[in-house]
């Protein structure tokens, strides 16, 4: 039994509530209270609550075991350390511990810190795609912004190979997992993870064949396995460059008939494949428009550029986009799936309401169109087009456009905050749609042979007067160490290139900070961390 605690109830009231809730049950084996997500008790209070609840539950269920989850409320930075101190007391009431989302420490740190008499059970997040414990491509966090914006946090998400990797990375620390779900969007992953728990060496392709035999009878199990693996492949790289999207969609169309459209699992796969193709086709079309419009802008033909950017989608795209609602209607009838708020009663657009997010911008078409209408000026618009261009001996990096392959994997458990699904009006350029949130950042840059430079960072505003050591070093030498951000703020740049809630901060970097044109740049802040979406090193002019 999973449950959460709140400070609104006393220990006695909480125990009474849970005992009454469990009273009709013929048995209760394990009680699994979450420390946070949700929950708002301090760690020591959480342990006292756990002990009281177990004491009362044992009156009805003498053999019930207590497995508290080390999920930390965000308001207590020291919650994790306090949890470890409580566990160091070797409490007899506790039989094991759970490791789940919103954890205050890594799984390795948890296992090292807690006596081996307490087994750890994993509570993996199989549901979510972004802003979560295991984001798409969690080992590199490079899910393309076009998908992250349009499919969002709870889209249909079979990721068999990736969750096999999750299982391999965690299984040596844990005694198993607690399979859970918040819907049917993660239907395939539940079977994959449960099968891996049963046999860590199982062939996941055979798991998918079994899935097909059980739930999609009459189809070639190999084809269904190929489709599911293909949906995972669809999410690799830029959708405009990924032909897997077309292949998977066409394969599903070849299997489609009236009878199979009554099978919700088939419709689930078809809906996801159709969404992927909508994103790919729209992105290809719009990138072509942007290229054509850019040519006109550079020639000063502003009105011609406007007409190009306003061009309608082709009929084939309109028909494809129009096919989504009938599929969503069918899924709602068959399984109660809620793919939008208005028609199907979804809680909010982030909770799997793909129909509400599928039309969010996937290119800078709308952004450029807005800029063109606001400033129909050749020079201004050329600057917008060249926003991210730098010289050969300069450097520009965007988390959204470039990913960690360019700068290397970061230390610790950073948080990648995707903000593109808020960009419904196209006011934000795509290069700003991913915001890195952590206490440290490190990257190596070379080829900086132009003398003195300027470092320009686009920070997300999060004012904190307590910060006194926002620190930037180049090759180990301190460039800045002081209150939050430091440097000098460039309001003109912000007005022209950024959106509200972001700051452009510039730091002077004299040539002595470079070693033969190379720089090992490190940013640290130990209290609240920092958030930024992009940076550039340009020659001082």
Model-inferred region functions:
Residues 2-219, 314-329, 333:
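Catalytic-core regions of glycoside hydrolase
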Residues 3-20, 34, 38-48, 102-109, ...:
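Generic structural signal for short, solvent-exposed loop/turn connectors between secondary structure elements
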Residues 46, 81, 111-112, 133-137, ...:
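Surface-exposed beta-strand edges and their flanking turn/coil or helix-capping segments
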Residues 146-151, 157-159, 203, 241, ...:
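Poly-acidic low-complexity segments
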Residues 169-174, 203, 223, 435, ...:
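Generic detector of ordered secondary-structure context
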């Amino acid at each position: 039994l999973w449950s959460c605690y709140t400070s609104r109830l006393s220990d006695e009231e909480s125990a009474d509530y849970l005992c009454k809730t469990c009273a009709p049950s013929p048995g209760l084996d394990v009680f699994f209270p979450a420390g946070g997500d949700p929950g708002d008790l301090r760690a020591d209070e959480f342990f006292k609550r756990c002990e009281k609840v177990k004491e009362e539950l044992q009156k009805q269920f003498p053999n019930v075991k207590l497995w508290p989850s080390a999920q930390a409320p965000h308001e207590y930075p020291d919650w994790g350390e306090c949890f470890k101190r409580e566990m160091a007391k070797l409490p007899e009431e506790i039989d094991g511990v759970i490791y789940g989302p919103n954890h205050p420490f890594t799984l390795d740190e948890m296992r090292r810190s807690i006596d081996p008499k307490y087994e750890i059970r994993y509570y993996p997040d199989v549901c979510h795609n972004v802003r979560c414990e295991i984001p798409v491509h969690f080992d590199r966090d490079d899910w393309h912004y076009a998908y992250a914006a349009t499919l969002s946090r709870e889209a249909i998400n079979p990721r068999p190979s990736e969750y096999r990797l999750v299982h391999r990375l965690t299984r040596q620390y844990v005694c198993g997992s607690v399979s859970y779900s918040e819907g049917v969007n993660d239907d395939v992953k539940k079977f994959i993870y449960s099968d891996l728990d049963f046999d860590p060496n199982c062939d996941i392709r055979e798991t998918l064949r079994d899935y097909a035999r059980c739930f999609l009878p009459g189809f070639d199990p190999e084809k269904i396995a190929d489709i599911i693996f293909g949906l995972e492949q669809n999410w690799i790289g830029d959708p405009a460059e990924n032909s897997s999207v077309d292949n998977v969609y066409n394969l599903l169309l070849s299997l489609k008939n009236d009878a199979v459209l009554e099978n919700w699992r088939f419709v689930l796969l078809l809906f996801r494949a159709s969404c992927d193709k909508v994103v790919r086709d729209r992105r290809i079309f719009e990138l072509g428009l942007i290229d054509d419009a850019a040519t006109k802008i550079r020639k000063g033909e502003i009105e011609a550029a406007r007409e190009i950017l306003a061009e309608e989608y082709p009929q084939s795209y309109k028909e494809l986009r129009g096919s989504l609602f009938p599929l969503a209607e069918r899924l709602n009838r068959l399984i109660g799936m809620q793919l939008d708020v208005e028609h199907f009663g979804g809680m909010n657009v982030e909770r799997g309401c793909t129909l509400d997010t599928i039309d969010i911008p996937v290119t800078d078409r709308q952004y450029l169109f807005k800029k063109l209408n606001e400033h129909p000026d050749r020079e201004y618009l050329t600057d917008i087009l060249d926003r991210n261009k730098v010289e050969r001996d300069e450097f520009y990096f965007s988390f959204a456009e470039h990913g960690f392959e360019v700068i290397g994997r970061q230390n610790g458990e950073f948080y990648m905050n995707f903000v593109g699904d808020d960009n419904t009006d196209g006011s934000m350029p795509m290069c700003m749609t991913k915001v890195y949130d952590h206490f440290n950042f490190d990257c190596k840059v070379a080829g900086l042979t132009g003398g003195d430079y300027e470092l320009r960072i686009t920070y997300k505003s999060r004012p904190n007067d307590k910060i006194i050591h926002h620190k930037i070093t180049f090759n180990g030498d301190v460039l800045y160490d002081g209150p939050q951000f430091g440097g000098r703020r460039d309001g003109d740049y912000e007005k022209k290139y950024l959106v509200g809630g972001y700051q452009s901060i510039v730091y002077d970097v004299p040539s002595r900070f470079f070693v033969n044109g190379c720089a090992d740049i490190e940013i640290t802040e130990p209290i609240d961390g920092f958030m930024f979406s992009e940076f550039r090193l340009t020659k001082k002019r």
